[in-house]
UniProtKB/Swiss-Prot annotation:
Residue positions, PTM N-acetylserine: S2
Function field: Nuclear receptor coactivator that directly binds nuclear receptors and stimulates the transcriptional activities in a hormone-dependent fashion. Plays a central role in creating a multisubunit coactivator complex, which probably acts via remodeling of chromatin. Involved in the coactivation of different nuclear receptors, such as for steroids (GR and ER), retinoids (RARs and RXRs), thyroid hormone (TRs), vitamin D3 (VDR) and prostanoids (PPARs). Displays histone acetyltransferase activity. Also involved in the coactivation of the NF-kappa-B pathway via its interaction with the NFKB1 subunit.
Gene this chain is encoded by: NCOA3
Further comment: NCOA3 is frequently amplified or overexpressed in breast and ovarian cancers.
Subcellular location(s) of the protein: Cytoplasm; Nucleus
Impact when changing K708Q: Does not affect acetylation by CREBBP
Official protein name in the record: Nuclear receptor coactivator 3
Quaternary structure (record): Present in a complex containing NCOA2, IKKA, IKKB, IKBKG and the histone acetyltransferase protein CREBBP. Found in a complex containing NCOA3, AR and MAK. Interacts with ATAD2; the interaction is enhanced by estradiol. Interacts with CARM1. Interacts with CASP8AP2. Interacts with CSNK1D. Interacts with DDX5. Interacts with ESR. Interacts with ESRRB; mediates the interaction between ESRRB and RNA polymerase II complexes and allows NCOA3 corecruitment to ESRRB, KLF4, NANOG, and SOX2 enhancer regions to trigger ESRRB-dependent gene activation involved in self-renewal and pluripotency.
Record bears the keyword Transcription: yes
Residue interval(s) of motif LXXLL motif 1: 685-689
Amino acid sequence: MSGLGENLDPLASDSRKRKLPCDTPGQGLTCSGEKRRREQESKYIEELAELISANLSDIDNFNVKPDKCAILKETVRQIRQIKEQGKTISNDDDVQKADVSSTGQGVIDKDSLGPLLLQALDGFLFVVNRDGNIVFVSENVTQYLQYKQEDLVNTSVYNILHEEDRKDFLKNLPKSTVNGVSWTNETQRQKSHTFNCRMLMKTPHDILEDINASPEMRQRYETMQCFALSQPRAMMEEGEDLQSCMICVARRITTGERTFPSNPESFITRHDLSGKVVNIDTNSLRSSMRPGFEDIIRRCIQRFFSLNDGQSWSQKRHYQEAYLNGHAETPVYRFSLADGTIVTAQTKSKLFRNPVTNDRHGFVSTHFLQREQNGYRPNPNPVGQGIRPPMAGCNSSVGGMSMSPNQGLQMPSSRAYGLADPSTTGQMSGARYGGSSNIASLTPGPGMQSPSSYQNNNYGLNMSSPPHGSPGLAPNQQNIMISPRNRGSPKIASHQFSPVAGVHSPMASSGNTGNHSFSSSSLSALQAISEGVGTSLLSTLSSPGPKLDNSPNMNITQPSKVSNQDSKSPLGFYCDQNPVESSMCQSNSRDHLSDKESKESSVEGAENQRGPLESKGHKKLLQLLTCSSDDRGHSSLTNSPLDSSCKESSVSVTSPSGVSSSTSGGVSSTSNMHGSLLQEKHRILHKLLQNGNSPAEVAKITAEATGKDTSSITSCGDGNVVKQEQLSPKKKENNALLRYLLDRDDPSDALSKELQPQVEGVDNKMSQCTSSTIPSSSQEKDPKIKTETSEEGSGDLDNLDAILGDLTSSDFYNNSISSNGSHLGTKQQVFQGTNSLGLKSSQSVQSIRPPYNRAVSLDSPVSVGSSPPVKNISAFPMLPKQPMLGGNPRMMDSQENYGSSMGGPNRNVTVTQTPSSGDWGLPNSKAGRMEPMNSNSMGRPGGDYNTSLPRPALGGSIPTLPLRSNSIPGARPVLQQQQQMLQMRPGEIPMGMGANPYGQAAASNQLGSWPDGMLSMEQVSHGTQNRPLLRNSLDDLVGPPSNLEGQSDERALLDQLHTLLSNTDATGLEEIDRALGIPELVNQGQALEPKQDAFQGQEAAVMMDQKAGLYGQTYPAQGPPMQGGFHLQGQSPSFNSMMNQMNQQGNFPLQGMHPRANIMRPRTNTPKQLRMQLQQRLQGQQFLNQSRQALELKMENPTAGGAAVMRPMMQPQVSSQQGFLNAQMVAQRSRELLSHHFRQQRVAMMMQQQQQQQQQQQQQQQQQQQQQQQQQQQQQTQAFSPPPNVTASPSMDGLLAGPTMPQAPPQQFPYQPNYGMGQQPDPAFGRVSSPPNAMMSSRMGPSQNPMMQHPQAASIYQSSEMKGWPSGNLARNSSFSQQQFAHQGNPAVYSMVHMNGSSGHMGQMNMNPMPMSGMPMGPDQKYC
């Protein structure tokens, strides 16, 4: 019967009673009783079933009415089971109560059990509550810490813990209780956890020892391994007091255990008897294949040489003990890596005796390293971290640290380098840089300096002046170029160069002395640059610890010597001695720098620095830096003992550091020439550093220049060249070189004088690599330089050219135009053919250059920029210009160098490109870049300069002209030549011209000082462009020379022109202009002059002020467009490209350029005239025709896209722009923009119309603008028929207007062309140019058209800048557009045309406007 049935029984029985009444009363009673019993039985069984089913989940049969029997059976089973379990439990209890139970009395007495256990554990027991107080400690603590039990009980555990271990200990303490309930979340932490901590030992005070020891030194810590149990169950049961405690057993860690029980890392250092590092052997670390070994070595050495880290030992005491006992062992110490990893280290040293004489020879120290993977120590090595300041301030500490790598390197090459000197402390710091006593100079230590003079490789260390004291260094650091690494934007460094180049700058001082020190130093410098240590170069130098490594100057100069010894070894000086050691030491001072540097190196494609282990990469970098320095005349640097060993190396090291080295060498060898060269170099370096403002830009440029720069570098040293190339960190090296040069500028004179004899000796050695400009050794090295420079050139062959070439071959001038060396990604290609030129130029220019450099010194910021721009016209125009302009607005403006740098649009490199490599080269040939040409022109107006010109790079170098040879027209033939070509204003237009092609980049650099800078740029640019065009047409700049033959022809023409113009003074140039009919052309562009004047009145000052901060490159962009226009004239395709490039550059720079467009416009007048003249002179009508054709073609192509105007500039610019833009990290942007422009040009009309419609919605004048655009399209087609004129006139107008057009390129970038400009002006820029010119002249055209057109452009490219700029420009545009020659007369109008071109970039009809604007040369009037 089922339970359910039973449940129903009562009901059933009731019904039965009613239905079946008993017949008899007795039966009725019996029947009812049975029923009740059954009902009750059913109820109980039902309840039982419920209990069973509730307790048993396996009774499935109960789901269906189980019968009573089944329920009872299951119940019985369960009851039995329960009883059995009870019996088992009782039996267990009995067992627990047995005699053997742990709860019973044991064989071992409880009192003795604890001590025995502790003895077996070799530790002591202590209990700490959650507040950190010791509530119990075992008596045997005395055996370990010398404290008595009562001394520690109820005291804070933190009193005996090392401050660095307190946080780790705190993590293991139980959490505080909440509402009396402790460890709510700690129940799972019952397992023991192990950690290490240092506990203070109570040591008896030794009176004598205490007197001489600091309180920290009196403290001795014992490293203990603690096994902690936070919440034992037993403790919980006993009470709450212990529940919140942590029970620890601390045991002593044996020395073997301390020093990395398994697979320890280690490296060996060799020290002289004074403890200075002589050599660093990192083979074991390298073999470990662990990442960041350079950083760990650097930091370990820093820590080892730093003040005691609260321990009772110091490096000095350690070696004293080793000296007395023959061996010594340090306690375990810790330091942290850049990534925060804690490293435990221990150093064991043995006294090394001469096996023959048994005399004490030195110490061999083995550093055991163990990385702690568990837990992060926020400041595991505060002392180590503090080492940097101590290293900077503490010679011994720093020396020891930096010295160890250097000495290791130096010692092999020559202990004389200060390794053995008492002043080696400073030297050791220097060693960090170069592996020689160079650091001594760096570190403020008399000993250091004395070794530096003694060593000559200390020249880098001559930075007795605080490395940080020289702001110039930081700006010039390739850090900027590299950077993305760059810790601080190079822009910061830009002003740093402002101090007299090299006066404070360790680079200049270092340039004179430490050459081999450079290798290690160069690595640091490169690292610093990579990290973006804008100003840290000096600080690096001053701080032997972290920053010392970064000192580019040290890296640059010293490595040249070091590399001379071992060109392959970045520690050239150390050669086989473990370049890594020096690099590591350097890294120690700059761990971050090294890391960043490695990153940037990889970014640059120069992982070689860090990738191949800094030993290899650094070697290459050092070699490059050294070689360049040598090329630049730094061979003198090798004058010291290092000199002989480094002669060959120096040659191979020419490239990255070659420029700087040769520059330094030149300074040393020809102190007088170098004095001026150094000043000029210093400024150039500053500008270069400024130019390489952003680490990203630097990184891109470096990446681009990596292969290319190396090519130029290779010319110096074949084997080393390759390495140098691999060291695409050339930028870094360049920065180092720049820094070095900067430091050397002022100190250079003194150092030059001091080192001059040495330099002469070194010169011979260095000249091999760089055909140093030093007269004595320049020719000697010339053949090698020739080897480096694809083109020939005796050392004499234009020291200017040699210097320029040097710069080119150097990082700054990876290519002839590689003044941006690192930036020259594209330029390198363009100038690869002319690399030889770069090297040779460097040499040639070097000798000639020093005097001129002095002159240019005044323009030093420009000089820096200009010289590099000469080299790197195309590749870095944008980048260099930005930094230079932004960093040195005035420099750009006032300084011809800047102009030259600007002027060398293709030389833009001069301004910016050089920063990377040329900058260092420039320092020597600061004017060299700009001046080298000028110097060449002056000294060798025809031959030297021609030599340079044949060298494509030198052509780019012509930006030397932008140096504003105009200040010295006669003295600067090239500049004059270009000025004549730009004759409108030899002084101003050259800058405009030069700036225009790449001036935009330059302008960007000059951002801050756009007004003056623009003129300077334009003026210099003109001269420079001529030359750069010769060296590298826009085509070359855009990519590897697109047409070598065409370039050769252009170069030949430019050479001839250069020779002619170089030999003619301003008057002669004017006569030539008249003969060419340039004055007439200028008269045609009278409107331009008024505009220029007006704009000049406004000058870039307003625009620059508006955009100076925002658009460093933007402003230059506008300036360049004018130059671009001029280039169009001067060099039909090249200049056309240049102009376009300028415009594009301008466009690119135009990101913040539109206001500057206005600024440029004032200058447009002169630049226009100069461009017209230059075009006519250089290219004649052919160039004009070519320019016209190019413009027409480009305009036609863009007609589809709104970048018609932009197109003309853009397409050529695309080529050139790719070069310099790529170099400026805008390479990709420029490419994308170019491709985008091409597409947009095809769709430009569509886009422009759409944009116009959109802008019409936004602006009431859009309808008018559309009409104007239609007219413009018609007129542009007409105007484009005379694109040459347009080109010429736009060249002139474009200098001003062109910059406006470059505004469009900014649009390519995030900013609209209007960005930073009045919206109305923006339209003016957008469309005002060609379409609005006619209409603008008659109407409000400029403003309306620009408004309408630009909106189109803006809509397509939507660059806010454009809008901002046009308002200023619109006023001018409208006022000028009214003039008959809107394009010619109105830079604004032409600017508008360029803006249209810009807009074209932006996708407007600019293409059409561009042609119109281009026409204005001839069709200016028709434009209206």
